[in-house]
Amino acid sequence: MDWEVKIETKLKDGILDPQGKAVKTGLKSLGYDNVESVYVGKYLEIVLEDINQKNKAAKMVEEMCNKLLANPVIEDYSYQLKKMEG
């Protein structure tokens, strides 16, 4: 069974976001004065193959996030796990 995984990471509350600040400044300089805040994160899509149980796939995704895809000290992550058809 194959699984489609969609992962989003973002900085934890209270962590400075220099990329978000730069994007906000850029948008304001382009005339988008109504932009109050911008937060930059990451979005990843991964396909896992040959895993028969959803809980095993979820455990693998959590391990990947904690070991490489997110920095658990400064980032939060969330994911969606969906069984692929076919």
Describe the residue ranges of each PLM region.
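Long, contiguous binding/interaction regions
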Residues: 1-41, 49-86
